[in-house]
């Protein structure tokens, strides 16, 4: 597989020649992050909104007749326009409320007592009965997510990382082979706008055929987010360690 041939590790870019060394450090770095205070959802939203505004300005500059390079971005793929609409506070808060059932930044909801199953996704629910016999549900991050995205949908790695950040997870992204550096550029912009996110995003341009490296990443993950067809799903099911949650998107 081709690609940008770089690694993003705690906000800094490294050559893939250092992959083994960095993977050796990764679990300890993730554990340090997870033992901290956790990722504030408002910081995530604020960073994403700023990113959307910056990208929107570039699109507007291009629309006024400037070239993409003059606007500060040598590429403006079609999906970037959708991304700018996606990265608005209204849309992000709506997404959090409809998919998690909580107000943005609250991280909890209440509903009548009884059993409720948690569906698949990059978070999980912990239930506590209150004295009023209502069930208070705390939405907690799953922990560490490994994102394996398909190469036939431009921008998919960015959208997958956004999902993981909104639920407070540490995210390891395995880039698709034909990404060409587009996703990394967007993610670097996001970290520049909100530096607190650097400890929650790791990007590896690793070949799917590098089984030892893939296995090491899978072993660090509490959940694996898989975007792809049946063969991709089956391959991850075979290699995922027992107990790892698989979050499958076709």
At which residue positions do the language-model features occur?
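N-terminal Rossmann-like NAD(P)+-binding subdomain of aldehyde/semialdehyde dehydrogenases
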Residues: 1-137
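Membrane helical hairpin/interfacial module
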Residues: 72, 76-77, 81, 172-177, ...
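Conserved small-residue-rich beta-alpha loop and adjacent elements
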Residues: 127-191
